[in-house]
Amino acid sequence: MQDKYTPAAVEATAQQHWESTQAFKVAEDAGKPKYYCLSMFPYPSGKLHMGHVRNYTIGDVLARYHRMRGFNVLQPMGWDAFGMPAENAAIQNNVPPAKWTYANIDYMKTQLKRLGFALDWSRELATCKPDYYRWEQWLFTRLYQKGLIYKKLGTVNWDPVDETVLANEQVIDGRGWRSGALIEKREIPMYYMKITAYADELLEALDTLTGWPEQVKLMQKNWIGRSEGVEVHFPYEVSTIGASGVLKVFTTRADTLMGATYVAVAAEHPLALQAAVNDPELAAFIEECRHGGVAEADLATMEKKGMPTGLRVVHPLTGEHLPVWIANYVLMGYGEGAVMAVPAHDERDFAFATKYRLPIRMVVRSTRDAYTDTVAPWQDAYAEQGRLVNSGKYDGLHFHDAIEAIAAELTAKGLGAKRTQYRLRDWGISRQRYWGCPIPMIHCADCGDVPVPDEQLPVVLPEDVAVTGRGSPLAKMPRFYECDCPKCGKPAKRETDTMDTFVESSWYFLRYASADNGQAMVDERVNYWAPVDQYIGGIEHAILHLLYSRFFTRAMRDEGLVNVSEPFTNLLTQGMVVAETYYRDADGGKKQWINPADVEVERDEKGRIVAAKLTADGAPVVIGGIEKMAKSKNNGVDPQALVDQYGADTARLFIIFAAPPDQQLEWSDSGVEGAYRFLRRVWSFGHAFVSEFRPQLPADRQLDAVQLPEALAAVRREIHVCLRQANYDFGKHQFNTVVSAAMKILNALEKAPRDVAAAHAQVAEEGLDILLRLLAPITPHVAHALWQDCGFTGDVLHASWPEPSEDALRQDEIDLVLQVNGKLRGSLRVAAGASNSAIEALALGSETAQKFMEGKPPRKVVVVPGRLVNIVV
């Protein structure tokens, strides 16, 4: 055995052993409970970052721990490989996205292996490979035939220079992020997944997800946004609109209907377009709205603007004729693209009405009695529920009664009805991009839209493509889009849009169960492994990815592909990795961010940074505070450099010890060095055991607790107390305190008296056995090497999780904290099973208590069994 800890050699040996024995390849086993542990798969961006390392370390600790607990553990890995970054890299580096992506996968796979993760690589998948997306296309055709996928016009952000559609986050101040061109809103044909068909089930099933954080469930609940309300029909004023019809609006506040003073429609609404035909000013305003954002977040912050159309509709209850305005805060994609405006009781309508001097009519007296006849500055109380005023026959009715009465009258008149509406919208999956899964549809002039037949799947994405950033490469590639119609055989055109990359990540966890099956999307093995028992990933995926995965699992269930409804039983959202930032002011008001590795810092007595300078020139830099590790702030730590210097086990140990998994992890170089020192101490103790203690073991290796000297019995007890606490903490995912327990065990072993050599060797052997098994999920390489070197049976990978010994925990005597009037005054040694009355007598008779009681009689004595005794005088 080497006397010094050399991480590179230790880790290479362990990893070679695991690979040669296929240690983590797993199959279904009906005789064992299964544990499917999965961390969200990475986008192959080029290199792992610390967020990746933390995510996968947490998952690996859980997977290895459950393996030691006797579970049949699956922990697979794959690559979320489609997406815009590959296209951007292709433009910058003049390399096809496929080549860039596969090179990144190779490099990152090597990194993951060097970190020692217990991954079943036989199930590896990459979403950009035809053997994966073939089945996505196959399911698309099934859902299309069922009506769960359909086609309609959708509003998008169009960059006229790059000739492409941009995501909302790519539009900056109304301009394309790359071209700088003014963005237009365009309506183009798109495919949608009918997630709204599952809205009720997705909402109601949230209550069954007891293993999910409440915050995530609340975010999904709000996103689905079920609301009970009333659909109100405002008949057209024929004299201004020129035809009969109704304008439909949905409201959750039908009680305020009598306060409606105008209606507002989206710029794309048919009434708006009709009004603009002969009105250039209105047409120009609609064009301006087309350049605005299409996200709700944009509407909340942008200036509210509008124009009157000259059209009018009729109030369904009062007969009053209300003006129709075009407003930039109304979206065509939400509800009917129209709202009834009640300025007195809606803050957004209030701001709009105040700006354009529209009538404001109070019709609700709030419970806080904020009612006045004239509306001054907006008060939150105006939006509250209350009793109706200025509402004719409905005056005096409270909120619920008013809604019921008004809904009943609207229904009777045929001008409305009660309705349930959802904030959730169907999922538009068409993307006018190259690097994605081709949509398996063919457009025929005679037959319309025709799904690609099964025998023609997959529709393979050409990989030898030059991406310029202008237009869709597929739309410029006749060899891709020219085809024959599967129905009539005439020349037709293949769909050139690709799918949203969230589609790939919505079912990959089910594909892992049978990733080797080339004949089916999934097979019966999926019903052994699904659902995922523990899913790990960032809370930024709380809504889209996790909601889409829940939807996909149900869609696949209803196709008879899986037997489960929920994809993930337990969800752990790990905290961010953060680090200090430093910068210098540069030209143009910009900041030049400096990596912490290039900075020398000065700290105060509490360890806080008070000054910093650049190592290269010794001149000061500005301390920017703690931020999430990011390229933009240049405060990242390269995991590869960390592993090269300290080893994977040190990186894993620091990540687990620095913070509980769901909390923010603050990077600390000194913390990394501390983790490395601890592992060197573990190694040194293992070496001492092999060279000094093991030869002193008696022939009969059975540890006799009765014969142990008291001091060694105390050491053994401390070890098992730590183990008991570690077992509890592991169950609570408090891995940092598991490491604390391991450190206490090592401290106890190092300080154990050695005067009775054989007994000491026995305690050392048992303690080291426990320590290595405790560390095996966290620092598996060190545990693997020392387990073998120290002569323990078999492979630590196959060892069971240690359990505390009641024999070791048993105490003849225990020490209690002794207090007088609640203040610590000493300790009191009592028999382990002493009664409360016996403890009281011992406490009152002790010299320490007598001294601090100062001759005063005790009022009462409080005994907390096993912990303390408090004398109150």
Curated annotation (Swiss-Prot):
Keywords: Aminoacyl-tRNA synthetase, ATP-binding, Cytoplasm, Ligase, Nucleotide-binding, Protein biosynthesis
Keyword hit for ATP-binding: yes
Protein name: Leucine--tRNA ligase
Localization of this protein: Cytoplasm
EC number, UniProt record: 6.1.1.4
Class of enzymatic activity (EC top level): ligase
Similarity section: Belongs to the class-I aminoacyl-tRNA synthetase family.
Gene assigned in the entry: leuS
Native organism: Aromatoleum aromaticum (strain DSM 19018 / LMG 30748 / EbN1)
